[in-house]
Amino acid sequence: MFRLFIYGIIAAAALAGGPASAQDRPADQRQRLLELAYALGESHALRQACEGEGDQYWRARMMRLVQVERPGPTLETQLRERFNAGFVALRGQYPACDEASRKAEAQAARHGQALALKLSQSTIQVRREAPAPDSVAEGEAAR
């Protein structure tokens, strides 16, 4: 279940990579990114309940998502806040590893997977400015 979730995140990140950034996404996709950050925070709390506080698996995935999406300062702050809110919400609710926390972990993974899949299926149109006529990018030597 978690492999599918992470594959979805990787797919979303791969499609979002390159010159596009989170600001280039429509509002509904930015909202999905925020929901994904929350799901990652939930998953982080639930995994730590069973694996210990040293486990940083989902936190590292969140950091990678921010790195790939390259959000502006406002959206980056919102992503981090949503991750932390998801973490806090389930950390208090599931402080120990038991059957209930494992079920919640699977549910968070399914939700995150669905969000990542929706994000990975979207395309982003990016406007690029034309390079200067005498630019090296066009194969001509700069004057």
Please report, for each region that a protein language model flagged, where it lies by residue.
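Bacterial N-terminal signal peptides that target proteins for export
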Residues: 1-8
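Small/flexible residues
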Residues: 5, 32-34, 129-130
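N-terminal signal peptide c-region/cleavage motif recognized by signal peptidases
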Residues: 17-19
